[in-house]
């Protein structure tokens, strides 16, 4: 059905149809748990055919309770971050250096998704060139990713860059869908960013039980919003990345999207984005497989930790040392 012929219902009608209170429907709309919902002033336009949203509060039985970060000491990382956070002046250098992290971020992310795009190709694209071998879709993904991460950096602040108004916590189910829609800008502008229609084993369920992707995303965001906020940001963002890779909510550009979401979460806590260069992607895949099979995040977290330490050291170099 095209956008011009889409029919909508209001909150009261949806509440009656789904057997929920109007207040609960508004909350689910604001959290992004209603497919295709559109904000209309103070109200919400809900597609007539939208399925009843899953409520994370009622899905605790399938939450992933097997996530294990392992023993670790983040004193070195937090010390670097603290030093960087009190740095004054030189906002221009921080922005330039942050932008320089994006080509290796993208080259590695594409490699993670099985696409061979070199660091130099991305750098050339961002310098205004048209590098051979890049498709239009790949170019748009590069530009859209840059937009998402630069916007997140401006909203949440980074080092001497002051934060603007932003949500706390920064991510939500609605925000993730909005990020994915931005990622698809110019590629699929008609997408409602609905979850793929599939059922997969849940991380915390015993036996061989499977649950729809929509249910698993609801419980993932419930855990993120209610249970993981007290965790160290590196652990929380790593759990988010691992679960997004397990669920693969949209079915396209899964690795890139999961790494973008992790980067946004890290930025909201005052850290730069994680940068895993293409040559370390085999290590990332191996570490990720441990999280899927055993819930063991220790190696994955250590990989991301070393990446953040390198990025923080770059961001704190003297201006004259940067070439």
PLM regions: where:
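FIC/Doc superfamily catalytic core
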Residues: 2-17, 22-27, 31-33, 40, ...
């Amino acid at each position: 059905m095209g956008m011009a012929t889409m029919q909508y219902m209001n909150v009261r009608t949806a509440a009656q149809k789904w057997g929920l209170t109007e207040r609960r429907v508004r909350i689910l709309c604001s959290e992004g748990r209603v497919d295709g919902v559109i904000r209309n002033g103070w109200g919400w336009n809900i597609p007539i055919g939208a399925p009843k949203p899953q409520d994370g509060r009622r899905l605790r039985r399938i939450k992933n309770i097997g996530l294990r970060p392992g023993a670790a000491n983040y004193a070195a990382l937090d010390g670097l971050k603290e030093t960087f956070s009190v740095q004054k002046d030189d906002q221009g250098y921080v922005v330039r250096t942050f932008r320089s992290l994006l080509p290796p971020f993208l080259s590695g992310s594409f490699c993670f998704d099985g696409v061979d795009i070199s660091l130099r190709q991305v750098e050339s694209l961002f310098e205004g060139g048209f590098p051979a071998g890049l498709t239009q879709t790949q170019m748009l993904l590069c530009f859209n990713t840059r937009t998402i991460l630069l916007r997140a950096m401006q909203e949440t602040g980074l080092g001497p860059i002051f934060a603007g108004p932003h949500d706390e916590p920064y991510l939500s189910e609605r925000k993730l869908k909005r990020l994915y829609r931005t990622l698809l800008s110019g590629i699929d502008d008609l997408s409602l960013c609905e979850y793929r229609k599939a059922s997969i084993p849940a991380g915390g369920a015993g036996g061989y039980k499977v649950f729809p992707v929509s249910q698993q995303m609801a419980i993932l965001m419930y855990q993120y919003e209610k249970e993981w906020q007290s965790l160290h940001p590196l652990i929380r963002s790593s759990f988010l990345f691992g679960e997004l890779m397990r669920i693969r909510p949209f079915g396209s550009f899964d690795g890139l999207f999961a790494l973008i979401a992790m980067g946004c979460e890290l930025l909201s806590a005052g850290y730069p984005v994680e940068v895993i260069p293409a040559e370390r992607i085999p290590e990332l895949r191996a570490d990720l497989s441990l999280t899927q099979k055993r819930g063991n995040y220790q190696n994955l977290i250590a990989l991301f930790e070393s990446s953040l330490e390198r990025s923080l050291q770059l961001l704190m170099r003297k201006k004259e040392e940067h070439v």
